[in-house]
Amino acid sequence: GGIQHAKVTVLVWERLVRLIVGSANLTRQGYRRNRELFAALDFFDVPISAPLSVLRDALAFIDTLCVWSRTLPAANQRIRDTTGQIRARVRRWSSAPQDFSPRERPRVGLVVSHPTPASGSAQSALKQLMQMWLPRRVVGLTVMTPFVGQQTNSEDTVLHSMRDLPMARDAEGWLIVPEAPAPEGAKRRIVPLPQHFGQCWKKRFGKNARVLLVPMCVDEVDERPRDLHAKAILIEGDSHDLLMAGSSNFTPHGMGIGVFNCEANLVFEDKADEKREGQTFDDRLGIPISWDDLVSMDDIVWQDPEEAPEDAPS
């Protein structure tokens, strides 16, 4: 089984439609306190609009969610009526691009996970991400996640599912995870994730395993404690980079590996290390610490969490 874990917002004005996909729940914690990551696309009837194919995919995903909705039929119908009205509105547009050209960069697409619907097949966010990347070689993999899966064997399920990615011999693996408060005088820093996952990460990347710990309160940045809740995967290659940001944790349910939540992410593709408005994909992760503040795997205590990940059905 799975849960509805996607966070998708569609805002409609007279001449503009905005799609927001992110990691934050529609709560005060999500929008005011946590460290979250959002991506927004604007659609309007001019040639510089984001291509309408992404919006249509998002509306189709919302319609799919309605299939499993347990709300009253009238509420469900209002959602379907709204997506239909948005489709009708943009159908009248004549200048907005319909899709990206084959070699156009940067480009973006919607990547979702969901269980098997009445007609069609289940969708895996990780499988789609890998299909977008292959057969390119990976020179760097960055994972930002507050949760990982609970392991039942010698391999981490998600890492094992990425085994077909061709890795450069010196590929770096960057793990951006929350830091738990340590007892006073402690010499090692605490990560509230299973020790087994840390072992699997080190096994995968060896001496090139990197860890960035994001504390709840960063000096000169935060006025109050803030939990890391953002989720992203950055794949870097020799000539191309892919950045996926949205609701998918680095867990089997989040990535759609054997078990499927309803998840939504945007995947951006660009030339390697390309700057847009002064920012690379690394910068857009928005981490509040320096990339130079990495921590040795040997200086970390991995602390098994007492509860299952938030995206696991209860």
Labelled PLM ranges:
Residues 1-314:
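PLD/PLD-like phosphodiesterase catalytic module centered on the HKD motif
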